[in-house]
């Protein structure tokens, strides 16, 4: 079975950057992207194979990333999936809110792609031991 990372982000440029950064780190997981929290929950509850990790953008249209995270954490089938909350925002209490809602890690989308790649790969290695 192929291991999948689910990316939840409404910005196609950010999705592509994440794909490029992950490819540069040598990760072998298949990447799947959805554009909203509602779409993520639909995908996760569809009966398809579950992803091994979720990268969830904090700011998504409709249902926020925090609300999406809360829904994932109360679902018995989904609550064990490691989840990294990602944001471009560097203002506000976002990081603590994410941890309070059940995020396993919090990652700022850096303007330096090398830094973003190193941080992301470090977290993936921590959560996705082969």
Question: Language model features by range: what are they?
Answer:
Residues 2-22, 54:
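Conserved acidic segment of CheY-like receiver
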Residues 111-123:
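C-terminal output helix
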Residues 56-58, 87:
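Active-site residues of response regulator receiver
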Residues 60-62:
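Receiver (REC) domain active-site loop signature in two-component systems and cognate sites
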Residues 33-53:
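Acidic, metal-coordinating helix/loop segments flanking the phosphotransfer/catalytic sites
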């Amino acid at each position: 079975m192929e291991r999948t990372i689910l990316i939840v982000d409404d910005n196609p440029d950010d999705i592509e950057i994440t794909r490029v950064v992950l490819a540069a780190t040598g990760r072998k997981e298949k990447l799947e992207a959805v554009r909203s929290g509602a779409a993520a929950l639909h995908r996760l509850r569809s009966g398809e194979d579950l992803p091994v990790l979720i990268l969830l953008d904090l700011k998504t249209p409709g249902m926020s990333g925090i609300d999406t995270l809360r829904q994932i954490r109360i679902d018995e089938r989904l609550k064990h999936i490691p989840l990294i909350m990602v944001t471009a925002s560097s203002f506000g209490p976002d990081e603590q809110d994410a941890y309070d809602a059940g995020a396993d890690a919090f990652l700022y989308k850096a303007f330096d792609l090398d830094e973003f790649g190193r941080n992301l790969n470090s977290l993936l290695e921590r959560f996705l031991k082969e």
